[in-house]
Amino acid sequence: MKKNNTILYYGCAAQARYASSNHGLLYSPSQAHLFNFSLARTYLNFSNGFRAFSTSLHLSYNQPLITYDLQDHTIDIEEMKKENLEKSFKSNTYIFKCLLNTINNKPINEKTQMEIEELLNKFTYASFSKKLEANQKNPEIIDYSLLNPKLAAILTDVRPTLISIINNLQKDYPDYFMAKLFKKSDKNEYYIGLVIKGLTPEEIINSIFFHVLKVLSFHTKKLDKSNSTSDIAFGMGKVLVENFYYNEFIKIKNKLSKEEQKCYYLSNWKKDNKDIVEKLEDNIFQFLLGQKISNLTKDTDLLDMETVTMAYREKSIVWKPTKKILKVLPEDGTLFVLPKKIPMIVKPKPYTTRVNGGYLSNDLYINENIVKEKWNLRDNTQILHFNQIFDLVNNLSSIGYKINTDVLDFIELYGSDYFKNELIDPRYSHPLLKKSKLTKKEKMELDSFLAKKELQENILGLAEIFRNIPEFFIPVNADFRGRVYCTPEYLNYQSTDLAKSLLLFSKPGRMYKKDYIALSYLKIYGGSSFGLDKLSANDRIKWVDKNLNNIKNYRNGKLIKEAKNKFLFLAFCIEYNRYLNCLDNHDVSWFDTYLPIQMDATCNGFQHLSLLSLDSNLSKELNLSESTWDDVPKDFYTFLVVCFIDYLKTELLENKNLTPKESESYNRLINMKIIREIIKKGIMTIPYNVSNFSLINYIREGFELEDNSLEWYIYKNEPSIRLKSLDFTVLGKGLRKVLHEKFHKLDLLLKYLDQVARVCTLLEIPIIWTLPTGLVVRQSYMIRDEVRIKPFNHSNKKFSMKVLNKTQFNNSKQITAFMPNLVHSLDAASLTLLLDFYFKESIDVKNIYTIHDCFAVPANKMECLISLLKLTYIKLYSDDKYLLKLDDDIRKNIRSTQNKGCFNEETLEITGDSFPDPIKFPDVQKVIGIVPSDFDFNVLKKSSYILN
């Protein structure tokens, strides 16, 4: 292409205008090689270079104007097209293309959504036939004979054998034999027969093939526990039971009148048949059922078993492809199955007290409650009549998203240039794949590589599927503490930075051009995603202004290559360019922004503990104190490092009992540059009651043994940092000691919570607390008994299984889990109250997503969100004084479970016949203080970094 002084401005409406060469080139990366200008009143001259004129410029989101500096770079359109095709990261996974076909060929409505859910959940999208013509007529079919003809032929050949085996299995359970089995004390075999007889051979084969193909996907993983025979058995058993439920439910539903059918759901059937359901939900039963069916994969020479050493003294039996299957598989791994749960193309069904929501098939052939219970808890979480949990889940699930196609296009075109450490080039084959025998370290390295590749393919593949969907939804549910989790796999806002960067809100936030605050938050986010979150807000704003040219010309890669969060920074650059281009459009006074900008709480677990205990000293280090945008945000980890070094120096001067090795370790740590990243993960876990052993291991995680050394460890991210084993112990124990000595009220709170858990454990009662959101958490961890079973027909190997003993508490778990569960529940309650404020705040578009202590909204809503978060903390900890309410909940539970008059409110002593000495209940006033605290909640309102 001939270069000249006239260059083109290329707009999203494919309109162009004249500009001189010092202005730069504007183009859409998604159409970088298409330059098709056949619009009226647009003139082009290609003989002497580009010349263009346009009457107007209209901006829509997914085709922004992007500046590119031609003084530094020249562009040859054909070369760029050729080069980018060679470096494409575009997902070429065949199974994703087939699902894309299904969505593209159908209207976006509830019927199509139901069809998608059925395809994914029942694995009805698979065909192994060689009759391509028939399959091509049905876009819902994934023809595995196209994906892998030899594998498809093997599965096609084995199908008649499987049908014959399954038919014989069903004949093995005649009615008289079932009656005989029912009379036995162990009814597992009876219920196995019940389920097998209640399914069609096709349903059983679909489950078998799904799990076989799951094992074959990236089969070269050496330490993949998801392919263990136990995990596959549980998974298969669960699927078969769900299919059985659906079949039985439909039988009953079809007998009802049309009016009755409208309000009859799977949950109704399960309540009516709770005795059967209780048995079929049993872990041992589902394992035995799944193992019986998965054994057929060995009988038909599809899979074989292998014993793998996972870790020291930890072995696992895993499913592996047989030699026959291995011959037809690619060595670098291929995805053979689609994720079962993906975003929805229509708004999720709302949860009510009567009907389960989320996916449209929920309460039809799947059954997922609004609160997902934990299997090792005896008692379920209770939702009170007046609650905010249903609104929380329904509101978050109703927020629409769309794919950031500009980010997706950029990644597909330039992934290998700018994201070498973040993405795996599709053409790259790991050298360890060709090595026959691997060391433990090499196995871990290869597994990590393949897991990353599988995650990347799923995220990019799903992004391609939803590329042209104008609005899709991400349903959520809650765990037993009220914490919100996304239901879809891979492509969701709680996934990786890659997934988050590909998500935009489907409806814009309106940001007025003169809204300095909103613009500032957008710039602050840009600086933070680049890696400058430790600078003051104003310094981040100045950095964006100073680097404006490279942000405009982000394709040159200068900033992207240096960015800490490259994908998020790329999304910011694209959005900021849209804003700059919008400034040129004088017909509108606002900018429609779709980008979620994220801000995090500072050490959120410690924030809740400081507010619970009203510890003003601790809160000052957690950005809960007065600050301005000129101030540098507090960094709790760096603060603790400084305190720790002071502690070591004091110990060296005053502690005469230090051993020579300890003194050597102290001096080494003092002279070494302890960076915050080394201690961050360990410190983060302290509010969650981590043991000293685990704390030390968290610190050690970032290190590895130096080559040819048995005593020196090097920090992986900075090999110049070298430590010995004793140094990790000194770090872990020293940091905890500093924390407790520096913050006395925190120490008192931790001791109080520990004592509460110990008292409840001694009394053998669950620990129950009520959250202001209407959720009642009932912590009741039970011990697990070991059961040995022999599930294989062809092997004498026995499995040791852990099953829940619902008669005996797990005392140690009850004690250690109380504080982390309480903190997580308070985190969840804060979010629930915040969203209640947020959705009632005004009638305009509500866009928000959350990752526990991270919040993302459009720039025009960030100021409002921060103000509401401050009000939430004040309501929860000042107005309602939650610690006193917690104390009252625990006492009420004790009084209700013990003999009348056993709890002396004055002495706080608990007496009873089952324990000889009185049990002392901790005094909450020692934490809060009889003298009013100097904690000033009004200071919260003046904090500029409560989110940063």
Curated annotation (Swiss-Prot):
Catalytic activity annotation: RNA(n) + a ribonucleoside 5'-triphosphate = RNA(n+1) + diphosphate
UniProt cross-references to InterPro entries, sorted A to Z: DNA-dir_Rpol_C_phage-type, DNA-dir_Rpol_phage-type, DNA/RNA_pol_sf, RNA_POL_N_sf
Molecular-function GO terms, alphabetical: DNA-directed RNA polymerase activity; mitochondrial promoter sequence-specific DNA binding
Keywords: DNA-directed RNA polymerase, Mitochondrion, Nucleotidyltransferase, Plasmid, Transcription, Transferase
GO biological process: mitochondrial transcription
Recorded superkingdom: Eukaryota
Any one annotated GO CC term: mitochondrial DNA-directed RNA polymerase complex
Documented EC number(s): 2.7.7.6
Annotated active site: 600, 680, 853
PROSITE patterns the record matches: RNA_POL_PHAGE_1, RNA_POL_PHAGE_2
Family to which this protein belongs: Belongs to the phage and mitochondrial RNA polymerase family.
Described function: DNA-dependent RNA polymerase catalyzes the transcription of DNA into RNA using the four ribonucleoside triphosphates as substrates.
Protein name as annotated: Probable DNA-directed RNA polymerase
Organism: Podospora anserina
